[in-house]
């Protein structure tokens, strides 16, 4: 599953393809007004969704379940109350997101829903992903693994890493290695603090 603009990221999409996804889920907001309705060149959310969803389905040979949120009357009334009628007018005139299921050929295999809250039903057959992969399997035979490689780091990212002071001696030479919890405890104790287990 990728959210909104993440579906534009080819590395994220390829990572999912390489893990063998057969059904991709794309979620989008109900509307994305990037300019006032009076200005040309605004972002066409509906068209962008159709292009991205179709491209991913075709490249990955997967079904893509696209789910866009919906703005109901209560939300529109609240926007008008908080942000004003001018902002509401821009939102009402902006292209809406769409909900649809796209098949492995890149074409819709369900009805297209836009601007209303509705449950979308669609029967899919995963066997339909097989033949298209015989033509272009970009995570298999139809790739140049001798030239291209994608590396994904699944390690957890720490919110903070404490580094030792730059000239502190650890062994034979000065080292700016990350401080372990034990290093931090020793440093606190040398400064007169004592750690107590709770």
Label each residue range with its predicted role.
Residues 69, 129-198:
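Cysteine/selenocysteine-centered motifs that mediate thiol-based redox chemistry or coordinate metal-sulfur cofactors
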Residues 116-136:
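A short, polar/charged loop-to-alpha-helix boundary motif
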């Amino acid at each position: 599953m990728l959210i909104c603009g993440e579906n534009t990221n080819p590395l994220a999409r390829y990572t999912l393809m390489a893990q063998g996804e057969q059904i991709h889920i794309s979620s989008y907001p109900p509307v994305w007004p990037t300019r006032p309705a009076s200005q040309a060149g605004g972002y066409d959310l509906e068209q962008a969704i159709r292009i991205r969803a179709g491209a991913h389905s075709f490249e990955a040979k997967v079904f893509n379940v696209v789910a866009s949120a919906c703005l109901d009357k209560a939300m529109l009334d609240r926007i008008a109350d908080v942000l004003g009628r001018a902002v509401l007018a821009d939102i009402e005139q902006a292209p809406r997101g769409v909900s649809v299921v796209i098949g492995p050929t890149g074409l819709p295999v369900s009805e297209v829903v836009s601007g209303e809250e509705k449950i979308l039903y669609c029967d899919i057959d995963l066997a339909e992903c097989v033949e298209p992969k015989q033509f272009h399997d970009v995570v298999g035979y139809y790739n140049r693994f001798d030239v291209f490689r994608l590396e994904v780091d699944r390690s957890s990212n720490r919110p903070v890493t404490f580094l030792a002071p730059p000239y502190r001696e650890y062994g034979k030479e000065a080292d700016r290695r990350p401080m372990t919890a034990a290093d931090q405890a020793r440093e606190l104790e040398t400064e007169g603090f004592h750690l107590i287990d709770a």
